[in-house]
A protein has these predicted regions:
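Flexible, D/E/H-enriched segments
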Residues: 1-76, 98-213, 224, 243-324
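Short HxH-centered metal-ligating active-site micro-motif
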Residues: 64, 86-88, 221, 228
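Short, glycine/charge-rich beta-strand/loop segments that flank catalytic centers
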Residues: 79, 83-92, 159-165
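Short, active-site-adjacent cap segments at secondary-structure transitions
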Residues: 89-91, 238-241
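Beta-strand elements within well-structured catalytic alpha/beta cores of enzymes
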Residues: 79-85, 189, 227-237
Length: 324
């Protein structure tokens, strides 16, 4: 059986930027929501400085939490870093949008600062800055083949379109904190989390049950291997601008806190019972990435490193570790 280390983190573009830039990011999101009405908690957090005080606190928590993950990852020294994240029309668009895709190339590039929201970044890096990561090609091909033979209808790609940024931000953004040096071989796995939310030409997202089953199939493959594999679930949980039960104006604290307790207590498999409509209403589209990881890791209690539930961030952010 492969040795496993689990990591959970967020990937929102603001995590790459100084807190002084967060307000502008919020304003871009608010503008997308027709008749946007800020919830009372957001107004309180904005205070008299348009949220800067809250943003400074939250940004430091994000950086510190990633430092904990990085320290554990590098001390553990995996043979493979499997990052499960969603591609938001960065490589997969209406012409080809599978529910799941395994990357099988020998290497992959990422341009994390090419996106306008990350031009003003913590590293002072130029927009064209490129990061190249080597990938475990033979391992990825073996996993792809095993999953398909195990009943997972899985796409694979040995190159990315990545018109502007290569790796999706769900993968490259966490890597800027975890392993920008590319010390460990990277295996990207892509999930269509947004589904029809992106428009009528996009197919529905896979169900939570199916995502958990894919994770279990991955675990069955890993049971035949001897590598040390770090499994990274990359996403925030509920997003205010996707939470339809709140007219896309507020994060779903009640649902996220309930789900967090299940993950904390080692009952993550319960999340597979969520319905597609519950995911849609709560704005928890990206939770599907975590559900796949939970399928791999099994019902083990998580060490919760940090939780950010400020409405100023527009999403509920959890940082977690699993020692398996």
């Amino acid at each position: 059986m492969a040795e496993l280390l689990g990591l959970g983190c967020s990937h929102g573009p603001i995590i790459l930027t100084p807190p002084q830039a967060w307000a502008k990011g919020r304003e871009r999101i608010f503008a997308r929501v027709p008749n946007y009405q800020p919830p009372p908690q957001l107004l309180q957090e904005l205070g008299e400085d348009n949220g800067l005080s809250q943003d400074i606190v939250d940004q430091q928590h994000v950086v510190d939490a990633f430092a904990v993950l990085r320290e554990r990852l590098h001390a553990w020294a995996p043979d493979v870093v499997l990052i499960i994240g969603d591609d938001q029309a960065e490589n997969f668009r209406q012409d080809n949008l599978p529910p799941f895709c395994m990357y099988t190339g020998a290497e992959v590039d990422g341009y994390p600062f090419q996106r306008a929201a990350a031009r003003n970044n913590l590293w002072g890096a130029a927009p064209e800055t490129r990061y190249t990561f080597r990938c475990p090609q033979a391992f990825a091909r073996d996993m792809r083949n095993a999953l398909i033979r195990d009943g997972v209808d899985l796409a694979s790609a040995n190159a990315l379109k990545g018109w502007e940024w290569g790796l999706p931000h769900a993968h490259i953004n966490p890597l800027m904190f975890l392993d920008p040096e590319g010390r460990f071989p990277l295996l990207p796995f892509f999930v269509n989390c947004y589904g029809e939310e992106a428009g009528p030409d996009y197919p529905p997202r896979p169900t939570p049950r199916r995502c958990y089953e894919v994770g279990r199939a991955m675990r069955r493959f890993l049971a035949t291997r001897s590598e040390r594999v770090a499994v990274v679930a990359s996403s925030s949980w509920s997003h205010s601008f996707l939470a339809h039960k709140f007219q896309c104006c507020a994060i779903d604290l009640e649902t996220d806190r309930r789900n967090l307790e299940l993950v904390r207590c080692g009952k993550g498999s319960t999340l597979a019972e969520l319905s597609p409509e519950e995911i849609h209403q709560s704005g928890d589209h990206e939770l599907l990435n975590w559900i796949i990881a939970l399928g791999i890791l099994g019902d083990r209690p998580a060490e919760i490193v940090d939780v950010r539930e400020s409405h100023t961030q527009l999403a509920f952010r959890v940082t977690a570790l699993w020692d398996c």
